[in-house]
């Protein structure tokens, strides 16, 4: 979960489809100066996330029970992170509106997602694809960094 840490931008981070809190909870622990919103649609998982947040006394974590496509925060996020939430096109449709102009959407993937990268991304472009090294794991992991088509890459 911490392999994405070097790629975070800004103060406001969203973890979409947070599930059991990965990568949001570990990132919030090591990045106390940033605010994390854990967005999860399942009530039972949200109650678990709230319990973990309270037990760890993470003042920088907000748990939001909502589907990403239905959530409209007052202020959009500098970085939106998603792990295991399906194809890039669907992720962009569901969570793209949560990203502030100039922000990034980081999609954690397994094998290099060649087919997904070749698909139309409707107003988005690939800023970078980072190969991730996960200690103790020999399998491929990649982080796809997306930005709006009109944003500068860099």
Name these PLM-found stretches.
Residues 3, 26-29:
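Active-site signature of alpha/beta-hydrolase-fold catalytic machinery across serine-
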Residues 18-20, 87-88:
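Short, composition-biased local secondary-structure segments
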Residues 31-153:
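S-adenosylmethionine
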Residues 1-11:
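Conserved alpha-helix/loop element of class I SAM-dependent methyltransferases that forms part
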Residues 10-19:
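Conserved class I S-adenosyl-L-methionine
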Residues 1, 16, 41-42:
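Generic detector of well-ordered alpha-helical packing
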């Amino acid at each position: 979960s911490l392999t994405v840490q070097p790629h975070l931008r800004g103060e406001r981070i969203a973890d979409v489809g947070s599930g059991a809190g990965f990568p949001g909870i570990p990132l919030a622990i090591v990045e106390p100066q940033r605010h994390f919103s854990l967005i999860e649609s399942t009530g039972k998982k949200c109650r678990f996330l709230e319990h973990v947040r309270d037990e760890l006394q993470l003042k920088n974590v907000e748990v939001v029970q909502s589907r990403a496509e239905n959530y409209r925060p007052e202020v959009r996020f500098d970085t939106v992170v998603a792990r295991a939430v399906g194809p890039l096109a669907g992720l962009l449709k569901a969570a793209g509106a949560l990203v502030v102009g100039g922000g990034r959407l980081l999609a954690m993937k397994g094998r290099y997602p060649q087919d997904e990268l070749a698909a139309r991304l409707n107003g988005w472009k690939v800023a970078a694809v980072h190969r991730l090294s996960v200690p103790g794991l020999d399998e491929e992991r990649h982080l796809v960094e997306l930005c709006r088509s009109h944003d500068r890459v860099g």
